[in-house]
């Protein structure tokens, strides 16, 4: 039998209907729902007199629009209406909901894994582009639009053209202070925001195998910023250990049977990809974005580039515009860029390991004068654990604001807006113009780099800093 990639195995396992020249109809194992992209979908069902086909394969939470302070008092009318609509829709259609009073509430791509809803071999969709996060478990996870949300609610299926396969193999060992966030920023920085266009990426190699599940989630989360339809990692013992005992994961003998099935999903030896990229881990350093898309980045040792450094006129024009928006001069060392805001959070970097890494930098120090720093845990469970471990107190003692869970300052859709013209060191995934608020200037970094920027008031090389034990 011809060796297959995990991508081919999961895809073929889920094809319900196929016709030459048309997209495949895929069965969907898990549909995650939030308050922003679902109201019109539910309204569509209502108007057509349809039910949700599989409420038991659907799970909802509220994350994008929720305040992270006084969360039950929602002043914005649009946000208030969206949250009320989700509560009403979940009641009417019998969908499980982790609402603002629930201990299970959080960012949808944080709670799916921590509750054990996310499992190897599943097809997973959500009306959010960073659904690719769940691919870290060896799942095929896509972001979908509102009309597709309605289609999945009604039929538990999705029409999809089968993408090509791209292997990104990261060999060797990462240097001290280099994180999963730096790896994915380096990939996008070197190969561009369209390297994955038309592909599903499988991340392989020694570096990926040595990563925790939370680090793999960071990598897969930003597959979308590389242009891919999805990104994933073949499941292994690290995956199974993470899932064991989680609320919605199989239990006892059923779990052992599931592990047998999950093991068989891994890409076969000799399987062929449409394209392969190899990266030497030792060439990756802590990264900082300087521009207005995630490929506009350099290492902490670098400088803001000159437009003339780029070969094409189109690139030069884009760089000029980005530098103007960001208020940066070519040739400026990255370490001399001042920051006025720091945001540690988002579906990319708001898990317990992210907060531990940031706390190691922060412990015993103070936030620099003129810097406002937020730490927003990705879920209420992460918040509780961080408080129990003493991490929250480390941040509070240093002058950080410690918040409830939500998407927060990742996107300018809730009260946590970055003011116009001010620079934010952010652990999120997008640095587009206006992403964190009108005129906000976003620099994407790892949690450790963001924490260091908060303490020093500008970017610093975390490899040169003393880290304190935190637990």
Swiss-Prot record:
PROSITE patterns: ACONITASE_1 (PS00450), ACONITASE_2 (PS01244)
Taxonomic lineage: Bacteria, Bacillati, Bacillota, Bacilli, Bacillales
Tree of life domain: Bacteria
This protein's pathway: Amino-acid biosynthesis; L-leucine biosynthesis; L-leucine from 3-methyl-2-oxobutanoate: step 2/4
Cofactor or coenzyme needed: [4Fe-4S] cluster
GO MF annotations in UniProt: 3-isopropylmalate dehydratase activity; 4 iron, 4 sulfur cluster binding; metal ion binding
UniProt keyword Lyase, yes or no: yes
Top-level enzyme category: lyase
Catalytic activity: (2R,3S)-3-isopropylmalate = (2S)-2-isopropylmalate
Keywords: 4Fe-4S, Amino-acid biosynthesis, Branched-chain amino acid biosynthesis, Iron, Iron-sulfur, Leucine biosynthesis, Lyase, Metal-binding
GO terms, biological process: L-leucine biosynthetic process
Residues annotated as binding [4Fe-4S] cluster: 347, 407, 410
Identification of the protein by name: 3-isopropylmalate dehydratase large subunit
Cofactor annotation comment: Binds 1 [4Fe-4S] cluster per subunit.
SUPFAM superfamilies: Aconitase iron-sulfur domain
CDD domains: IPMI (cd01583)
Enzyme Commission number: 4.2.1.33
Gene3D superfamilies per the UniProt record, alphabetical: Aconitase, domain 3 (3.30.499.10)
Assembly and oligomerization: Heterodimer of LeuC and LeuD.
Protein family: Belongs to the aconitase/IPM isomerase family. LeuC type 1 subfamily.
Function, as annotated: Catalyzes the isomerization between 2-isopropylmalate and 3-isopropylmalate, via the formation of 2-isopropylmaleate.
């Amino acid at each position: 039998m011809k060796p297959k990639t995990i991508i081919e195995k999961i895809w073929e396992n889920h094809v319900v209907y196929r016709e030459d020249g048309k997209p495949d109809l895929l069965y969907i194992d898990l549909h995650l729902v939030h308050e922003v992209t679902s109201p019109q979908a539910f309204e569509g069902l209502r108007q057509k007199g349809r039910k949700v086909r599989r409420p038991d394969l659907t799970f909802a939470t509220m994350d994008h629009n929720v305040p992270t302070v006084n969360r039950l008092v929602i002043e914005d009318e649009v946000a208030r209406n969206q949250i009320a609509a989700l509560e009403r829709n979940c009641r009417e259609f019998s969908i499980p909901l982790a609402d603002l009073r629930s201990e299970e509430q959080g960012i949808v791509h944080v709670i799916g894994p921590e509750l054990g809803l996310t499992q190897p071999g599943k097809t997973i969709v959500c009306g959010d582009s960073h659904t690719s996060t769940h691919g870290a478990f060896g799942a095929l996870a896509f972001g979908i639009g509102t009309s597709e949300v309605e289609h999945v609610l009604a039929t538990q299926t999705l029409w999809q053209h089968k993408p090509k396969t791209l292997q990104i193999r990261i060999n060797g060992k990462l240097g001290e202070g280099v994180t999963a966030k730096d790896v994915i920023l380096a990939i996008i920085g070197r190969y561009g925001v369209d390297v994955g266009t038309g592909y599903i990426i499988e991340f392989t190699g020694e570096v990926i195998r040595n990563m925790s599940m939370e680090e793999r989630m960071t990598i897969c989360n930003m597959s979308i910023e590389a242009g891919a339809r999805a990104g994933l990692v073949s499941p292994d013992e690290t995956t199974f250990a993470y899932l064991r005992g989680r609320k919605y994961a199989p239990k006892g003998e059923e779990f052992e049977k599931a592990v047998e099935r999950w093991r068989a999903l891994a890409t076969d030896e000799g399987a062929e990809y449409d394209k392969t990229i190899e990266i030497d881990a030792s060439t990756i350093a802590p990264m900082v974005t300087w521009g207005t898309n995630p490929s506009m980045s350099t290492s902490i040792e670098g400088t803001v580039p000159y437009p003339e450094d780029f070969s094409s006129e189109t690139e030069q024009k884009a760089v000029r515009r980005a530098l103007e928006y960001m208020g940066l001069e070519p040739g400026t060392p990255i370490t001399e860029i001042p920051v006025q805001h720091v945001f540690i959070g988002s579906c990319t970097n708001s898990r317990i390991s992210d907060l531990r890494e940031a706390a190691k930098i922060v412990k015993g120090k103070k936030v620099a004068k003129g810097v406002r720093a937020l730490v927003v845990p990705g879920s209420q469970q992460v918040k509780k654990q961080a408080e129990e471990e003493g991490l929250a107190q480390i941040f509070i003692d240093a002058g950080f604001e410690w918040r409830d869970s939500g998407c927060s300052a990742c996107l300018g859709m809730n009260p946590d807006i970055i003011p116009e013209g001010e620079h934010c060191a952010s652990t999120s995934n997008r640095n587009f113009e206006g992403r964190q608020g009108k005129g906000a200037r976003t620099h994407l970094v790892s949690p450790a780099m963001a924490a260091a920027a908060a303490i020093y008031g500008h970017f610093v090389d975390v490899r040169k800093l003393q880290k304190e034990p935190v637990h």
